[in-house]
Amino acid sequence: MDTFSYRDAELFAEGVALSRIAERFGTPTYVYSRAHIEAQYRAYADALAGMPHLVCFAVKANSNLGVLNVLARLGAGFDIVSRGELERVLAAGGDPAKVVFSGVGKTRDDMRRALEVGVHCFNVESGEELERLQRVAAELGVKAPVSLRVNPDVDAQTHPYISTGLKENKFGIAIDEAEAVYARAAELDHLEVIGVDCHIGSQLTQLEPFLDALERLLGLVDRLAGKGIGIRHLDLGGGLGVRYRDEQPPLAGDYIRAIRERLHGRDLTLVFEPGRSIVANAGVLLTRVEYLKHTEHKDFAIVDAAMNDLIRPALYQAWMDVQAVRPRDAAPRRYDLVGPICETGDFLAKDRDLALAEGDLLAVRSAGAYGFVMSSNYNTRGRAAEVLVDGEQTHEVRRRETVQELYAGESLLPQ
């Protein structure tokens, strides 16, 4: 479903004109659709109906409290990688018993806080982490539920920066070492083994890597059962891709159906950690044209959003669709859309055919995931506002940063 559509030659988010949002909240502004978020979550939950499951939204994709609250109200779980993300989930009304704690660098404080609030499990990524968790749990006099993140050595066929399931990646425990680590976990009196986890990458557009990883994990589950180590849940992580341009990723329902067909009656709770597929196409970055600059070699549309607001094009060479909020009936020109940051790499899109004038509003599509969460204050620029649209209602779920807030935590040297 696409909740961003044109009505009377103007782009709307659900029932609200984007021009109205720009007038009220300014630009640049991230705009999210509640209806899209809910529909994408339900696509997972509905496909898993009739079997024990947990759909844990990957907070790293979009950690805004308003977005998290929408998902918490639906009964979602959450996949976190830091104490900060845990506190966000709690503040948004999330159930800690539905939280899985991933990440390669959990500190002792991270572990203590997660044990205090009672997370569902820790996705342990190394033998060293396992031993630390045992010590922290012993200090608190509790048992820590653990699932080992296993690296199945599967090529996710995605951008190398977001491929996480190969031997050379920093994530997880190599599958040929996993049985020994599980045996050690079973010996430790303050740990309880409950599952196996993997996450092979992000923005996957084919089922084959997922199914390859699944077969390897099921083989591991069977071998562990033969050694008396029971696995109760199978966490297949996230990674399902979305359409940015012309990709044709599988639908969540087709993906889950293929997984269920291969379980062959095993009594396992299925856990998924979707992020991008829930929120990417639920959001746009709304920006305004400041200048049109024409040179001998290039035409530039200089907009008020920049790489500090949306770094995906510069960092990943990601293609983002750009639409005029009010398209002009004029001959287009080919523009690079660039921001005010003092780097050549500050661009949102290149070689786009658009009919533009100074002051026009543009919507950078598919910006709901890894957009605001990766933003910065580079060039001492305040981060954008965030607005959540619900039907014909708009809610400012994060106000724009002021200049004074950018240095509020700093101080001068004493005289």
UniProtKB/Swiss-Prot annotation:
Catalytic activity reported: meso-2,6-diaminopimelate + H(+) = L-lysine + CO2
Signal peptide: none
GO MF, one annotated term: pyridoxal phosphate binding
The UniProt record lists the keyword Zinc: no
Cofactor(s) recorded in Swiss-Prot or TrEMBL: pyridoxal 5'-phosphate
GO terms (BP aspect): lysine biosynthetic process via diaminopimelate
Keywords assigned by UniProt, alphabetized: Amino-acid biosynthesis, Decarboxylase, Lyase, Lysine biosynthesis, Pyridoxal phosphate
Family: Belongs to the Orn/Lys/Arg decarboxylase class-II family. LysA subfamily.
Protein name: Diaminopimelate decarboxylase
